[in-house]
Amino acid sequence: MRQWMWFLTTCGAPLALAAQASDSGAFVLTLGKDTIALERYVRSGDQLVDDMLLRNGASVTLRHYVATLNPDASISRVELDTRPTGASDPPLLHGVATFKPDEVFFETTRNGNRQVAHVAVSTGVLPFFNYSYAMYEVIGRRAHALGGNPVKVVVIPFAAATPEDLTVTFPKPDSMGVAFENDAPTRFKVDGAGRIWGVDGRQSTQKVIATRLASVDLAAAQATFANRPLGTLSPLDSLHVTIAGATIAIEYSRPAMRGRTIFGGAVVPWDHVWRTGANFATRLTTSDDLVMGGQTIPKGSYTVWTLPAPAGWKLILNRQTKAPCEAAACALPTRAWLWGTDYAADSDLARVDLKVEPLPRPVERFTIAVEPRGNGGVLQLEWETTRASIPFVKK
């Protein structure tokens, strides 16, 4: 935390609860001990100007957008620039989105290549920028304008092909929850004017915490973090082994501890089904039938889940490997892999006990291994100071 405190200006007391014509603020976003982004915004009249420094990639990037606000808390136009750090660097992406009653028109230039797209949408759809809490304030105001609790707010990521639904709730006058489909909500501390004063996403997929400040010096932040990207926060990994004549492949994402308590904490709570990784559901494919925990696992592909608990862990193999679909969409070759929040117990193939033991030293990044043992092998999951494992044999 000390690495960025010197270029932050701390916020004062909350502003008046009545809506303001003009407002400004900043957010510092952290994932465990790591600062992953900083945001600064100014809202004046019908214009929202937002600047953000993002570290969650191969390089540190700067994102700038200007949105034109409507009286009903919808948006009519957004212009976006994303560029690497360094004032002379050209934009990686420049784009303009124009919002009409039944469509969004995107004009984008990426690495010199211009593209245009028309996307059919419902009236009042909002743009969505990951980690932009200034835009979450707009989402909250839009939810109030629509009325209801909960209320659905439709958003579309910049240049995306399809919109997405957010569920917005107001549990108390000073709180708001925002959730994507099948995900736990990010929780916000808000005031009567819709300003966000605190963000707790530890129960959601992203796990991010954000703190509001009066301002942030992005130039100083850029100098501090320019050569210190965090890379992909939970990088994709895979393994491919042959044991006792059976070929086993596993694809999964690898979250890191980042100074957090993992098991029994907010990252992996006890007695909740865990995606056993991050992002998309972990997938296991076997070329031959296996026997695991006394149960036969037919050859094929499965998603891998776990149910950690203080008294013991369960390994869950599930038949569902692709995203939920309807009718003809289920046959499309472009159908996405299953996201890690879309677990469906009615598709379980097997639930078996895992052996759980402590590790002599912490494992920073979640790791899956398959190793030979006896006349078969063992599947091992390691993270923090815990190893969970189960032996198997080829049938």
Feature locations, PLM:
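Positively charged n-region of N-terminal signal peptides that target proteins for export
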Residues: 1-4
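N-terminal mature ectodomain segment of secretory-pathway/periplasmic proteins
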Residues: 30-109, 170, 178-180, 194, ...
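Bacterial N-terminal signal peptides
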Residues: 6-16
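Short acidic, Pro/Gly- and aromatic-enriched capping/linker segments at domain boundaries
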Residues: 23-26, 223-242, 277-290
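Solvent-exposed helix/loop surface patches that form functional interfaces
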Residues: 90-181
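Extended, well-structured beta-strand/loop surface patches
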Residues: 229, 251-299, 305-395
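Short, exposed beta-strand-loop hairpins at the edges of beta-sheets
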Residues: 188-189, 196-203, 378-383
